[in-house]
Curated annotation (Swiss-Prot):
This is DNA replication ATP-dependent helicase/nuclease DNA2. It comes from Rattus norvegicus. One of its GO terms (cellular component) is nucleus. It catalyses: ATP + H2O = ADP + phosphate + H(+). It is found in: Nucleus; Mitochondrion. Key enzyme involved in DNA replication and DNA repair in nucleus and mitochondrion. Involved in Okazaki fragments processing by cleaving long flaps that escape FEN1: flaps that are longer than 27 nucleotides are coated by replication protein A complex (RPA), leading to recruit DNA2 which cleaves the flap until it is too short to bind RPA and becomes a substrate for FEN1. Also involved in 5'-end resection of DNA during double-strand break (DSB) repair: recruited by BLM and mediates the cleavage of 5'-ssDNA, while the 3'-ssDNA cleavage is prevented by the presence of RPA. InterPro entries: Dna2/JHS1_DEXXQ-box, DNA2/NAM7-like, DNA2/NAM7-like_C, DNA2/NAM7_AAA_11, DNA2_Rift, DNA_replication_fac_Dna2_N, P-loop_NTPase, PDDEXK-like_dom_sf. The gene is Dna2. Acetylated by EP300, leading to stimulate the 5'-3' endonuclease, the 5'-3' helicase and DNA-dependent ATPase activities, possibly by increasing DNA substrate affinity. It is an enzyme of class 3 (hydrolase). Interacts with BLM and WDHD1.
Amino acid sequence: MEPLDDLDLLLLEEDSGAEAVPRMEILQKKADAFFAETVLSRGVDNRYLVLAVETKLNERGAEEKHLLITVSQEGEQEVLCILRNGWSSVPVEPGDIIHIEGDCTSEPWIVDDDFGYFILSPDMLISGTSVASSIRCLRRAVLSETFRVSDTATRQMLIGTILHEVFQKAISESFAPEKLQELALQTLREVRHLKEMYRLNLSQDEVRCEVEEYLPSFSKWADEFMHKGTKAEFPQMHLSLPSDSSDRSSPCNIEVVKSLDIEESIWSPRFGLKGKIDVTVGVKIHRDCKTKYKIMPLELKTGKESNSIEHRGQVILYTLLSQERREDPEAGWLLYLKTGQMYPVPANHLDKRELLKLRNQLAFSLLHRVSRAAAGEEARLLALPQIIEEEKTCKYCSQMGNCALYSRAVEQVHDTSIPEGMRSKIQEGTQHLTRAHLKYFSLWCLMLTLESQSKDTKKSHQSIWLTPASKLEESGNCIGSLVRTEPVKRVCDGHYLHNFQRKNGPMPATNLMAGDRIILSGEERKLFALSKGYVKRIDTAAVTCLLDRNLSTLPETTLFRLDREEKHGDINTPLGNLSKLMENTDSSKRLRELIIDFKEPQFIAYLSSVLPHDAKDTVANILKGLNKPQRQAMKKVLLSKDYTLIVGMPGTGKTTTICALVRILSACGFSVLLTSYTHSAVDNILLKLAKFKIGFLRLGQSHKVHPDIQKFTEEEMCRLRSIASLAHLEELYNSHPVVATTCMGISHPMFSRKTFDFCIVDEASQISQPICLGPLFFSRRFVLVGDHKQLPPLVLNREARALGMSESLFKRLERNESAVVQLTIQYRMNRKIMSLSNKLTYEGKLECGSDRVANAVITLPNLKDVRLEFYADYSDNPWLAGVFEPDNPVCFLNTDKVPAPEQIENGGVSNVTEARLIVFLTSTFIKAGCSPSDIGIIAPYRQQLRTITDLLARSSVGMVEVNTVDKYQGRDKSLILVSFVRSNEDGTLGELLKDWRRLNVAITRAKHKLILLGSVSSLKRFPPLEKLFDHLNAEQLISNLPSREHESLYHILGDCQRD
């Protein structure tokens, strides 16, 4: 089945039936809901489907769980698995996917205290750090995975990061005091660390002094463990390895031979774990006359020397991860950098067993966040693991605020069920919130969680280990069989340029493009997710990637694969914004009042009080270039104390308006934060702004920014200015009153210390409320620009849509009419095309900007030749002459008589007859002299896009853009052809065509000519389309195509379309 796009998923949701299905199918659907690509199998990476779970008492009266499991998709070949001792507490259910470690030579599988491991949902990879943190508090671990951005940066974290890097560099170079000093200074000058110092308002000198306190301990450790003459000189330790014989308790001398890897990234689908090992070291264990060599994980800690259970647990989990790459290290090392004290951490079966049980509990809590409500009942968020009562743990917990908030807003538990010591803390942490605030929080938590569990948003990285590269290449999101071709180049610290070629033959057809984020793995099983980065260049011969690790240490014969890193369903940022909105701060309180409580926005009475005298001439000159509604928008923004909404109807010069607004605000001395959801939307405004010599700073990764804007990026400016001090970085930030970034880029350190006078959010009507919130925390006033009568925020989950997730902040605040100004003069569509949208959507408010715009028609210099051909061959079909007539800007071609039935295949909807007609029309317009670049073809389903694209490729037609409505938002073409696709007798239309906003966008993309193609009888069943047909009929703009008309066009369509 082909991969579904966002819109196909909406269709499939609607068309799914409610018929009774076999039990096996129900269980398989449950498994697919969590991990759709899982293939059941035996072996090292076995995957079993749980068919039934029964709790029993054995002959000794102890509780056991008996699981009926299978590796057959049909539910055959059933096997019994018995969970004994502590494993019986694992929260496993029918429909779960599991992995079992142990001996399966004889049935049943038995997992008990002494043998085997049981992994619940192994394709959910959980970090070792999260599992270790759950030892003390499982609730904290779940909250940290859910509200990740709430774990804010601290001084200790920054010092720890710098010390890690200095140690990691030194172990590969030298621990000599002068070398350590040099490495420390180099590290402190790196821009990424300077940015964190800026965030925390720390001076470079105070950070340097604190870092230097640790350096003597680095040298001391190296002198003890690395630089000795004989093995007897190395420190003695008591290290018992599970494989040791009876002498296991005798002391041994430990020699750290060398560092083999730094920040080694390992993903383990066997154990459902992932992590980065600080340092992977080769160690010699000298015991008596024997020497054993082991490759082991070394974990670095910069805090208090505690040798705590969390620290030791983390090391033990890294020994499990290490088994994916090499033989079991059986132990690891814990090094406290403050003292240079190193502790051995044996990884015995008992410790690994208990940690994997915790991992299972954490996986269960993360996967089961929403109740699967009974039919007719609304979904609801489930309670998190219980609140603990441990004053010290809670006092320093970074998730304390979210813990209290979730308890009050979502769980709404009675005081008696909360530990007594925590009740006052929960009340104290949430007493500033009203019932309406808590309800807003819980509703958006639920909707975001539902959306994150939608099929398309839940695409994790599991295809890397579940699907061979050769198969995944068909989707265009993967390239396999790659080899390195040139020496790796170090671009800057932590970034390495790699070149790859296909081992045999050219690159396959791919959707990967420059700028795409990717994960690089080895083709062999043990080399999953070696590195992350992005595509720098790609063509049919080679691909160049900038990666976060140097892979030159791997053998030259290593085969690699590139997988696109999907970012669908990232709810960390919106949940973080939602959490911030509930904080007890002035900025959050103000936004709660405006957004949740609908406090009336306030305005200043007189423009003279905000317009500086020396800016009046500049502002007047800018206003001269604007029309009346645009000037009204400028005035409304300048007078606002809270917010303004600018409704940018189609073609009304939204980008020009925003550009003028930034220029005026800048002339008045105001600072401006310019944002939107996409990089392209931000850069479109900046491209226009740059022409007016307005200085700005563009935040974000350079490779995602338009080439002409890259010189304005922070990255490029830091490079050109050779910034190596905090003072110079502050100077850069303070010298740019206009800053631009995406809504997802607000975690940048600059925003921790800067508040802007105005924040402008473009495309605000397409942005989900919690995402749109992000930049608003950092401004005194905000301007939302959009049009809620065009595309809303895309929501895939039907329940989330029903609960209101598609309501943007723009739509929510539009009820305060005093804050709204409309742009109604448009410069895109001629009068006839505009009248369609006026009738359907805008109640006659749209008007043409000039007579030239109103009367503009398509230019077809060769139309005379085409007409001669038509009159010779098609005198019986007058519709053909009419449809190409420039003076007929709008035409609906009705296929009812043809007929043109739809096809549903491989989960997608297409209409081959419509596709053939579209290609015929396109080729004829090109013959008549229309440039292919001036033509756009729109269809609501990806299957139809592919059908049209295939037919175009097999014809003589040039490159014509074929895309969904969503991809055309904000853009236009001289000629637009729309294929509605749906044509059936049962009334099925799909969610897409019911959405009047999507229809509005489709009909407002054309400047000079709009051709609509579809079945009137099928489409008119739905109000938006019925309204469209009423208008088209009244204007006599519908042409009924004759029976079997597509066949009569075959000799023009060509043999390629007869298949």
